[in-house]
Every structure is written in structure tokens, then in C-alpha cells.
Amino acid sequence: MTVRIDEVDRKILVELQRDAGQSLDEIARRVGSSKTPVWNRIRKLREAGVIGRQTVVLDAEALGFEACFFVLIRTSEHEATWQARFLKALQDRPEVQEAHRLAGDIDYILKVRVRNARAYDAFYQALISEARVHNVTALLSMEEIKSTTMLPLEG
């Protein structure tokens, strides 16, 4: 279900996406409102499920996670029990930053962040021991050109 938002809500969301740590006073100033109405709008947006949890963005490379792999998975298994086991394995692995079920020749794509190739191999061995897959292709990202969680709300 799509939640209706007005222009002030949109401006608030743009500011929160830009920097969720800024003060209510700063957000209010930037959107042309005052602190209490902005706080009330943020509260309503949270209650409506538009705003989820807040977190921080860490620099993976600065913390030693230098390898990012995109993992393409094909499976011949489609039973509910296999899928539940596989999805749990993905959710339990902290290396998996994103996991998507796809239409087409590839069944799943994962974004996996690890320290190095040896760590990827350990991840891979653990994954295939938990759930049988038909074919796995790992693609090493040579350079991250853009990475964002911001939605294009402006315009």
C-alpha cells in the first residue's frame, strides 16, 4: 500500500535520507517549518511505516572488508522446505548485505561483503553445506562507483 505524502513530508524525508543525525531544528529550518510540526510529521511517517529503523553507514574498506562479491545462484530446488532453509541460511549470514529472488535464468543474486577471497570461500563453503544449489557464479566488484540507500524523492 502506498502512503500519501505531501511536499513538506517529501522535504523532511529528503533531509532525513541526507543526514538522519541532524537536529529537528536543522531539519525544520531546511524545510521551512518549525520544530514541533516537523517532529509530529516524522512521528506520523514512522507510524505509517514510511520511516524504518535508523542506522549509520560504515566505510567497509576502512574496516578491512575489501572484497565485494555479487553471487548469482541457480537452483533446481523449489520446494517450500528447501526455500525456507535457504532463505534462513542467507538471513543468518552477516556477510550477505542484500539478497534478491529474480525472474529469469538466475534464481537469486546476493551482495556479499567480506575481507578477502579466503573469507569469501569460507562463506561459500558454509552456504553450500546448508542448502544445495545447482550453480553458483561469484563476480568480484573491481570498483564501487555508486552505492546509496536514498530514494529519488525530489522532483
Label each residue range with its predicted role.
Residues 1-155:
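A compositional/biophysical signature of low hydrophobicity enriched in polar/charged and small residues
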